[in-house]
Amino acid sequence: MENWTGRPWLYLLLLLSLPQLCLDQEVLSGHSLQTPTEEGQGPEGVWGPWVQWASCSQPCGVGVQRRSRTCQLPTVQLHPSLPLPPRPPRHPEALLPRGQGPRPQTSPETLPLYRTQSRGRGGPLRGPASHLGREETQEIRAARRSRLRDPIKPGMFGYGRVPFALPLHRNRRHPRSPPRSELSLISSRGEEAIPSPTPRAEPFSANGSPQTELPPTELSVHTPSPQAEPLSPETAQTEVAPRTRPAPLRHHPRAQASGTEPPSPTHSLGEGGFFRASPQPRRPSSQGWASPQVAGRRPDPFPSVPRGRGQQGQGPWGTGGTPHGPRLEPDPQHPGAWLPLLSNGPHASSLWSLFAPSSPIPRCSGESEQLRACSQAPCPPEQPDPRALQCAAFNSQEFMGQLYQWEPFTEVQGSQRCELNCRPRGFRFYVRHTEKVQDGTLCQPGAPDICVAGRCLSPGCDGILGSGRRPDGCGVCGGDDSTCRLVSGNLTDRGGPLGYQKILWIPAGALRLQIAQLRPSSNYLALRGPGGRSIINGNWAVDPPGSYRAGGTVFRYNRPPREEGKGESLSAEGPTTQPVDVYMIFQEENPGVFYQYVISSPPPILENPTPEPPVPQLQPEILRVEPPLAPAPRPARTPGTLQRQVRIPQMPAPPHPRTPLGSPAAYWKRVGHSACSASCGKGVWRPIFLCISRESGEELDERSCAAGARPPASPEPCHGTPCPPYWEAGEWTSCSRSCGPGTQHRQLQCRQEFGGGGSSVPPERCGHLPRPNITQSCQLRLCGHWEVGSPWSQCSVRCGRGQRSRQVRCVGNNGDEVSEQECASGPPQPPSREACDMGPCTTAWFHSDWSSKCSAECGTGIQRRSVVCLGSGAALGPGQGEAGAGTGQSCPTGSRPPDMRACSLGPCERTWRWYTGPWGECSSECGSGTQRRDIICVSKLGTEFNVTSPSNCSHLPRPPALQPCQGQACQDRWFSTPWSPCSRSCQGGTQTREVQCLSTNQTLSTRCPPQLRPSRKRPCNSQPCSQRPDDQCKDSSPHCPLVVQARLCVYPYYTATCCRSCAHVLERSPQDPS
């Protein structure tokens, strides 16, 4: 029945829309009245002022401060002294200065001002109805974005309701004041509404010229959106003059089942014959917002107050609920007319704006929030750092069924530095408890970087975290070296009188200073700070080289030695925070001073700067109100006075929904989805698409829609209720024993599946479930056993106590020998060695034969033999004859046979022999030379040797005492004369000689090595003069004269044998020139 009652009204609405279709063709053929806009973009806005910095995030130590700003639409100034212009266009381009025109677009197509009811998405800003067209794919939306023209409906762009609907005819004589949530138009004092005989809207292009004349319109009633703030009881109903009964919208039963049907408001006839629209909860629909419309007239959406980004979701009047645009009040002369006052109540100013539901959100380039580090008072020493406190917060929470004492784990890099990684005390693993630490936590100890929102931010030179600004070459924060200026020169004036003379002034902000004398001089550089305070070389005192702080920086004073050929110098990195003066203490003429520094210079001021384009000053448009009766003529006004007539701007009605040329008559619409694949936790479902008619919105056969344009029914995640908790057991550990019975362990935790996946929950949630075992017995294989591999061996001795052994091994189940550790758990190992007793031993002395040689060639000598004590089992070693070690027995010492005896080969006879000494050095260091040795005749009688006269050995052949020798190849070398006699016979004297360098042919040369030159002088006769041989120094051989004669006193043997004779030789030797 509902379909039959609504169909006539639909036909009537189509007939009334035909004139508008013709008008649309004219508008499209002429100049465009629409704002070229791209989806997802708004007009250019301006940043509001920064709010004050918030308080520090930490009570002590280092924290973070925040501040923000909002993006606002450009304000429009009101100049009462200028005449009111015609109504400006509703596009952001209309705010540009005259002559500039709109911005260039990448596409010649433009978006319509109104949105057709067949689309669910109407523009760059989305309100409660913004998701009506989400079922369309991105490809379809992009293809039809520039072709469809949709009407702008209340609540479409973020406001959610229309705060005011103005009736053009009122039957009440006593108008009531509108509620706070309704927008009121109030006229100024002493001025009345002047209706226009022919209401017209005059949209203007960028250059201000009118383009198209629009037909008169009336306002319609729209119920508020459920997303907006609730209406008060007195504002929950809105009165409108009844013209015709609105046609109810038709919806498909399947769409209703899927929850996409927007319920229509209920209408009742109230007092005075007015309709009352009661607000009902609304849902988005592909057919737009259902609102009662007056038959024969098209609704005129009311302009809204622009809102910034920070005002979204605060209702039509911001936070306070009070309109900041012009208020509407009834005109006393015309009860049905409403005039606006240019007063904003508590916020009265020269700004002018109207509440428009189609006002877009402005877009601004740049950052809307800034953060900086803040330093509070140092935290108490006993208080842990913030990261330790955050880890300690998990001490009372079980992890893997156990409580731990958590401490920070900071041995991480990169993005993990801002994660809360904690390590249980005494364990060798760490856990990431949260993905980000609290804002203001240091990324790592001792570093300036701070964690904010899980990111490690470094402070820039401006103090803002993450700004990335660095000082340029001249110290400008975030500069590009464009303002850097190098100041340098040479001071070559000869100088004035002696003393301090100012030579250079260094301004504040100077960097990389270099001041140096060109050459060494007796002059000194001096430095003075503000007020003439001496810093370097002041008060006629010369300071040592070093570092000195002045002007906010550190100056390095250098005074090199004069040998380097450099003068004094002063240098500093800067920047200087105060100006400093450089002086010279003149003591001679100026050798020249070089100086240079870098400073940031401000941009040059042009003599005739180009004026900046003025901010567009738009006057408030004249808003015309339709009178309740016949229009009255406009009263004349005095020339030169400002007309403050106010009227409501008339807007073209939205075109009737129709299918654009070239678009299919039907489209695929998402009406729901299949059941979730999981009854609990996370699952998937598939969307359901139906073929819908664009004209009627009814379901069509699938063949009416293009098969290629059907969106893919891709699976989408769905979330059900949480699943029941369950015990989750980990993997069993390895068996505690490699063989034999052992135990295994595993971890057990209570888990529960939610929509986002499974996670650990407290074990109490699984208390009603049987708890699985966490330990179990295990046996990998049987252990090995000990096996005796051989019998006992023979005893190590033949008699007495000894040792015997056998082979014992660990054998596995397969009979192979295995490690002894596998038998450790079984019976003890059998012994592999033990003691043995072979009975008492019998002992006796055994000896060998006497040696065949006598120890002496003549006279009495000694013969030897071996004597041992032997038992019946083994022989005793040396020294065991009496003790019998190892046998427990011993041989009788009294019966031990002797092991030595005397022998004689007859009496000895004296013999003589020649004895030769060692060869001496070669007489020539190079070339051919000779070697000498000593030869003496020695008599032997038994073991006694005596040196005798060489005549006693004359019967024997004498060995040679001289032989030739060959040295190295001859080179120039040093030659010396014999030493001269000692200058003193005792108590020290000197000897001298001549030294010359001779070549191989015995001529003087200078090519001898100087380091090998022999000494020309030496000491001699250093003994005391009273020294005499003592009585104990005697000659013990009668042949001492021969020893002296043969020069054998150099040998220790002869020195001891012939002590007195050799002592006299030593007394005379220093005087011997040879």
Swiss-Prot record:
InterPro entries: ADAMTS_ADAMTS-like, ADAMTS_CR_3, ADAMTS_spacer1, PLAC, TSP1_rpt, TSP1_rpt_sf
Keyword annotations of the record: Apoptosis, Extracellular matrix, Glycoprotein, Repeat, Secreted, Signal
Biased composition (Basic and acidic residues): 132-152
Chief site of localization: secreted
Signal sequence residues: 1-24
The keyword Lipid biosynthesis is assigned to this record: no
SMART domains for the chain: TSP1
Domain TSP type-1, chain residue ranges per copy: 48-93, 723-782, 783-842, 845-909, 910-969, 970-1026
Residues annotated as domain PLAC: 1029-1066
Modification after translation: N-glycosylated. Can be O-fucosylated by POFUT2 on a serine or a threonine residue found within the consensus sequence C1-X(2)-(S/T)-C2-G of the TSP type-1 repeat domains where C1 and C2 are the first and second cysteine residue of the repeat, respectively. Fucosylated repeats can then be further glycosylated by the addition of a beta-1,3-glucose residue by the glucosyltransferase, B3GALTL. Fucosylation mediates the efficient secretion of ADAMTS family members. Can also be C-glycosylated with one or two mannose molecules on tryptophan residues within the consensus sequence W-X-X-W of the TPRs.
Cited PROSITE patterns: PLAC, TSP1
Record: glycosylation sites: 490, 773
GO cellular component: collagen-containing extracellular matrix; endoplasmic reticulum lumen; extracellular region; interstitial matrix
Protein localization: Secreted, Extracellular space, Extracellular matrix
Record field: compositional bias (Polar residues): 103-119, 206-226
Residues passing through the membrane, by range: none
Tissue: Expressed in colon, heart, leukocyte, liver, lung, skeletal muscle, spleen, testis and placenta. Weaker expression in bone marrow, brain tissue, kidney and pancreas. Expression studies in fetal tissues reveal strong expression in heart, kidney, liver, lung and skeletal muscle, but weaker expression in fetal brain and skin.
Biological function: Positive regulation of apoptosis. May facilitate FBN1 microfibril biogenesis.
Related illness: Ectopia lentis 2, isolated, autosomal recessive: An ocular abnormality characterized by partial or complete displacement of the lens from its space resulting from defective zonule formation.
Subunit structure: Interacts with CTSB. Interacts with FBN1.
Protein name (Swiss-Prot/TrEMBL): ADAMTS-like protein 4
Organism listed in the record: Homo sapiens (Human)
Name of the gene: ADAMTSL4
